[in-house]
UniProtKB/Swiss-Prot annotation:
Pfam families: Response_reg, Trans_reg_C. GO terms for molecular function: phosphorelay response regulator activity; transcription cis-regulatory region binding. The modification 4-aspartylphosphate is found at residue 52. Phosphorylated by PhoR. GO terms for cellular component: cytosol; protein-DNA complex. This is Phosphate regulon transcriptional regulatory protein PhoB.
Length: 231
């Protein structure tokens, strides 16, 4: 799934700060500074919207009301960003259909945590199918495909790839992978993690997608579709 976020914010400095920060966290960002532009940008199918309350012309609340009436876009989650901080404002925002509410000023790290929490709630818990580029996983059937060609993996290799694709662009140490995949089995050593990483890459290699599993020196491993980090 494309990690595309629409930022609707009329203050240029704030909008550009958020856009730069999220781009560094591997989100695709599109921007709008007013209601009319946001309506046009929504056609680019963002998966989440960061929305300022006070916009030129019409308000963020009116934007939410408009979106919720559009069948194609009604399910897109919305996080409201605003200087309005009263209890009544928060209730009005959430009742209008926003999924979360953050008051200005805010920490970029808090914003990121809120985005990821909404993302997990809306997408990860509902989805039984993960796709990044042309590599996809059917969670229910425990099958992996690249361009509709099935890739045969062992149970452990599948668990490893599934975990990585659930958490793209994040670096995990061998210890963390032991905990997540092998649940701290005392008989499993760090070398076992390295061995399964090699096996997984070997099985992905015939499909030219082994580079998704990347080594981060001194830290561990990550899943990334960015070719600049190709092994």
């Amino acid at each position: 799934m494309t990690r595309k976020i629409l930022i609707v914010e009329d203050e240029c400095a704030i909008r550009e700060m958020i856009a730069l920060f999220l781009s560094q966290k591997y989100y695709d960002v599109i921007e709008a500074s007013d209601f009319k532009t946001a309506i046009n940008k929504i056609k680019e199918n963002p998966k989440l919207i960061l929305l300022d309350w006070m916009l030129p012309g019409r308000s963020g609340i009116q934007f939410i009301q408009y979106i919720k009436k559009q069948e194609s876009y009604a399910a897109i989650p919305i996080i409201m960003l605003t200087a309005k901080s009263t209890e009544e404002d928060c209730i009005a925002c959430l009742n209008a259909g926003a999924d979360d509410y953050i008051t200005k000023p805010f920490s970029p790290q808090i914003l990121l945590a809120r985005i990821e929490a909404v993302w997990r709630r809306i997408y990860e818990q509902q989805s039984q199918f993960i796709q990044i580029d042309e590599l996809s996983i059917d969670e229910n059937a425990q099958r992996v495909f690249f361009q509709q060609q099935e890739i045969n993996l062992s149970s452990t290799e599948f668990k490893l790839l599934h975990f990585f694709m659930r958490h793209p662009e994040k670096v995990y140490s061998r210890e963390q992978l032991l905990n997540r995949i092998w649940h701290n089995d005392l008989e499993v050593e760090y070398r076992t993690v390295d061995s399964y990483i090699r096996r997984l890459r070997r099985n992905l290699a015939p499909f030219q997608c082994e580079h998704y599993i990347q080594t981060v020196r001194g830290s561990g491993y990550r899943f990334s579709s960015y070719l600049r980090d190709k092994q």
